[in-house]
């Protein structure tokens, strides 16, 4: 009897765990809100940067394409940023959670990837190709459930891809800020001023939670500055930002101005 009760207890724990997973994993139905992975690689010096570029360009991105993901973004800080030469941002979009969960297994079985990326994947412990990397996993907002690729005629080293992170003091404040973007109309204002958004999304796993992140794009730094001036002075923003329900929904804003690499799909 005791053994049966013990087994029943284990099963109860597993069932409870299983049904708690959808809080993170179930997400929206297939074909609706996408999921995004942002990898942030920390590097030191030109040597690591060159090895990172070689790996991403010739091994990782082609393998991800073979795995069924046609678009991968790679970005680096602008030249006047103190993080220039120290960080590489990787953006991978997934049509659903299953595609995210399957990618690792597909890469492990991809012999071409294993061969072409060997020097990076299995580098000597005392000569690593990067210091560390962190992963942020996000779910797209319902008012922009699918990412977009902007189209510019300017060279890549002139384009600005602005990644923003908005942290909130509490879960309730974070939810209200997401509401402000969606139902409140903040996304619509960005559309009106021509901010060329790539995505808006809620961080569901990662550091500095609760928070949301989004990326807008511009043909040049001049276009970037003009768009933000237009946003700040837009009558819809003045009305929206004055509403009491949205007060104090953001406690910290982090802004990262980036250029796409020459081999980025963006």
Description of each model-found segment:
Residues 24-114, 118-237, 246-266:
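Short S/T/G/P-rich N-terminal loop/turn motif that feeds into the first structured element of a domain
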Residues 1-32:
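Bacterial Sec-dependent N-terminal signal peptides
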